[in-house]
Design a protein with these regions (language model features):
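N-terminal capping/linker segments that flank leucine-rich repeat
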Residues: 1-91, 95, 101, 108, ...
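Leucine-rich repeat
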Residues: 68, 89-93, 109-115, 131-137, ...
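Conserved hydrophobic beta-strand positions in leucine-rich repeat
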Residues: 72-76, 94-98, 118-120, 137-142, ...
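Per-repeat structural element of leucine-rich repeats
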Residues: 82-83, 104-106, 124-128, 148-150, ...
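Ankyrin-repeat and related helical/solenoid repeat scaffolds used for protein-protein interactions
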Residues: 275, 287-342
Length: 360
């Protein structure tokens, strides 16, 4: 899941030798000074300087400074970096990748105001206030940290993609100002109130799964949404989704849903997941003829006849329902996977060919 959120952020990186680190004690205004004093600075800072020298493929500070001062992209992912102070003078950087390190202090980044992409996922960050000055950011990835206060992000109105999953966020009020967002990834947090999302009408991708959401009324205004993940919440009323007619992918499993009639209008859906709910009447799905994947596992469904119109289905998951008659599924000739396990089927003959498609 995580890779799908920002696989486009990959940059090449050298295979670098790693060095032990500790806390910074001295500061300098530019990389050249950091480098020339690398034998007297803290082990943490020295480690970062050594990495930058290796990326530059030189041991000469002047040459490395010249090269690094002219590069616009740096990938420092997974290099055991703790102290990023030696980066503070590289104001020309537009893309900076710092994922999978041990960074807790982002203060050295506050002067890098030309950054358009910043990735600092899987670190030890709780305070993101230094980022408030980075107003040119378009893509910001901060997942898998210890962030609870996202108020510094309110100033970053040029953001088009914001990734904050696996944090400790409950209040998302600051995002209401980020009206240029196309993608917002907030799963695995502690969010219950999504009212601030109402203004984000440019969103086409929204991940909110595994939170504490019950009221999805604010989503009704997000008419450009194409992908919406809401599984693992406390949702029962789907009415606000009726207006989201551009949706292609909707994932709602593990909620408290029984009435799916609001989904009737979502005729552009290609993938729909309604597993682990309390749905018995699936007749509203008749109109969703563009569906290629439909997941209805773990529901109290007994009548599957409404599915016979969905003849574009490649995958149909009916695992663990109460279906006894599957003859109506014989019209689904494009199926490549049909999961019927856990149903009281009387005549266990696969309704489509070949029989290997069916799982009983």
């Amino acid at each position: 899941m995580k890779e799908n959120c920002y696989t486009y952020l990959n940059f090449p990186i050298s295979h670098l030798k790693l060095i032990d680190a500790a806390q910074p004690m001295t500061t300098y205004n530019n990389f050249l000074d950091w480098c020339k004093h690398k034998e007297t600075i803290s082990p943490n800072a020295k480690h970062t300087v050594e990495i930058l020298l290796q990326i530059s493929d030189t041991s000469e500070c002047d040459r490395a400074n010249e090269l690094l001062s002219n590069t616009t992209e740096l990938n420092l992912k997974n290099l055991q970096i703790t102290d990023i102070s030696p980066l503070s003078s590289f104001a020309q950087l537009t893309n900076l990748i710092l994922g999978s390190n041990q960074i807790s202090n982002l203060a050295p980044l506050q002067s890098l105001t030309n950054l358009k992409t910043l990735v600092v996922d899987v670190n030890q960050i709780s305070d993101i206030s230094p980022l408030s000055s980075l107003i040119n950011l378009s893509i910001l990835v901060l997942d898998t940290n210890q962030i609870s206060d996202i108020s510094p992000l309110a100033a970053l109105t040029n953001l088009t993609a914001l990734v904050l999953f696996d944090n400790k966020i409950s209040d998302i009020t600051p995002v209401q100002a980020l009206t240029n967002l196309n993608a917002l990834i907030l799963y695995n947090n502690q969010i219950s109130d999504i009212a601030p999302l109402r203004s984000l009408t440019a969103l086409d991708t929204l991940y909110l799964y595994n939170n504490k959401i019950s009221d999805i009324t604010p989503l009704a205004s997000l008419k450009n949404l194409k992908t919406l993940f809401l599984f693992g919440n406390e949702i029962s009323d789907l009415t606000p989704l009726a207006s989201l007619t551009n949706l292609n992918k909707l994932v709602l499993f593990q909620n408290k849903i029984s009435d799916i009639s609001p989904l009737t209008s979502l005729t552009n859906l290609i993938e729909l997941n309604l597993g682990n709910n309390q749905i018995s009447d699936i007749s509203p799905l008749k109109s969703l003829t563009n569906l290629t994947e439909l997941y209805l596992f773990n529901n109290p469904i007994s009548d599957s006849s409404a599915l016979q119109a969905l003849n574009n289905l490649f995958l149909l998951d009916l695992y663990n329902n109460q279906i006894s008659d599957i003859s109506s599924l014989q019209s689904l000739q494009k199926l490549t996977t049909l999961d019927l396990r856990g149903n009281p089927i009387v005549n266990k003959i696969c309704p489509v060919n070949p029989e290997s498609i069916c799982r009983f």
